[in-house]
Amino acid sequence: MPRKGVTIYDLLLSCPGDVTDYLEIIKESVESFNRTFGNLNNIEVVTKHWSTNSYPESGDKPQELLNKQFVRDCDAAVAVFWTRFGTPTDKYGSGTEEEIEEMLLAKKQVFMYFLNSPINPSELNQDQYQKVLEFREKYKDKGIYAIVDDKFDFQRQFTNHLSLYFL
């Protein structure tokens, strides 16, 4: 039987390429949230990511096309950073930064996380990591991010934050 009166929230998943395995954790957490709390409260959170919610299109810069296709329609975003900041766009230092700024300018919720996990020094791109640190410094007084130590800590914190925000 269809559920009547369900409120659906679109959650943008935004992150550079070094944390793509965290996307699965986010999706699992959202699915668990929907099963546990969503049914009881008539809400559903739907994840959106460029890899599944965009289509080939021409006529503008790639990030602007993504923004038009689905980013601006999202109700909230979750962003995760570790050692890479991402690929620059025409407006910002990375697509992830542009998506965060789009959300903040629209006064929408951004769940932002920075990983504090060790990395093999030979795998570290110092320029990219410096951009992550500068970005974190830029937002340190806005209170919009959390530091996480590993995947378990991230899942625990994100699930808690999801519940606190949507319930």
Feature locations, PLM:
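A short helix->loop->beta-strand "cap" motif at the edges of active sites that frequently abuts
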Residues: 105-115
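Conserved TIR/SEFIR loop-to-helix hotspot centered on a Trp-containing motif
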Residues: 58-62, 83-105, 124
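C-terminal interaction surface of TIR/SEFIR-family domains
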Residues: 2-3, 117-167
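A general structural detector for well-ordered alpha-helical segments in enzyme core domains, enriched
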Residues: 66, 96-99, 131, 135
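Conserved N-terminal substructure of TIR/SEFIR domains
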Residues: 1-80, 106
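Solvent-exposed loop/turn segments at secondary-structure junctions
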Residues: 18, 54, 84-86, 117-120, ...
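Extracytoplasmic/secreted cell-surface and envelope-processing proteins
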Residues: 21, 86-90, 121-123, 156-157
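Generic beta-sheet signal
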Residues: 80, 113-115, 148
